[in-house]
């Protein structure tokens, strides 16, 4: 079971009814099911903030010391490393609950990127959601090898939902 809490701090998000708890749960489940280590956990929790440029800028300054708005910020609740997701992680077997973390999405940046990249807002949001969930479970793109692995997973998951590769 995946419990999703959504906070909408910007009304433009309400125009996109497809972006809801059901979609977020479905995407999250599709990411997690790829890793056997998560199979013993009965309940996951994920917090989503749907916000605007001003708030994402504040968050990016506060937590990353970057003076720029961004499309999405991920705040993992656990210190996971994707390299370990394919081997047995003992700590995951001691609990049947896991709070994955928090994700903040910026409407204006996602909207502008979707227009520039000629894709639907919803499809771009889904890509950013997959990307951010992968960050929550320990993936990153700090070097080319890790970026290629993360992007390959994103492409695979997007294709499951009928969305073409963004790369």
From Swiss-Prot:
Its main location: cytoplasm. Keywords: Cytoplasm, Endonuclease, Hydrolase, Metal-binding, Nuclease, Ribosome biogenesis, rRNA processing, Zinc. Zn(2+) binds at residues 131, 135, 141. GO terms for molecular function: metalloendopeptidase activity; RNA endonuclease activity; zinc ion binding. One of its GO terms (cellular component) is cytoplasm. Its cofactor is Zn(2+). It is an enzyme of class 3 (hydrolase). PROSITE patterns: UPF0054. It comes from the Bacteria. One of its GO terms (biological process) is rRNA processing. Signal peptide: none annotated. It holds the Pfam family YbeY. It is found in: Cytoplasm. Its EC number is 3.1.-.-. InterPro entries: MetalPrtase_cat_dom_sf_prd, YbeY, YbeY_CS. Single strand-specific metallo-endoribonuclease involved in late-stage 70S ribosome quality control and in maturation of the 3' terminus of the 16S rRNA. Belongs to the endoribonuclease YbeY family. PANTHER family: ENDORIBONUCLEASE YBEY, CHLOROPLASTIC. This is Endoribonuclease YbeY.
């Amino acid at each position: 079971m995946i419990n999703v809490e959504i906070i909408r701090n910007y009304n433009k998000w309400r125009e996109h009814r497809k972006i809801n708890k059901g979609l977020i749960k479905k995407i999250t489940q599709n990411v997690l099911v790829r890793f056997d280590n998560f199979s013993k956990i009965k309940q996951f929790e994920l917090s989503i903030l749907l916000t605007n440029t001003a708030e994402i800028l504040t968050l990016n300054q506060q937590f990353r010391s970057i003076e720029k708005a961004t499309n999405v910020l991920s705040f993992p609740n656990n210190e996971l490393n994707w390299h370990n997701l394919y081997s047995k992680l003992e700590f995951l077997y001691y609990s049947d609950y896991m709070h994955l973390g928090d994700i903040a999405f910026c409407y204006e940046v996602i909207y502008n990127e979707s227009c520039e990249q000629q894709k639907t807002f919803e499809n771009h949001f889904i890509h950013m959601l997959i990307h951010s969930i992968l960050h929550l479970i320990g993936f990153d793109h700090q070097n080319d090898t890790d970026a290629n692995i993360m992007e390959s997973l994103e492409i695979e998951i997007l294709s499951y939902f009928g969305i073409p590769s963004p790369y």
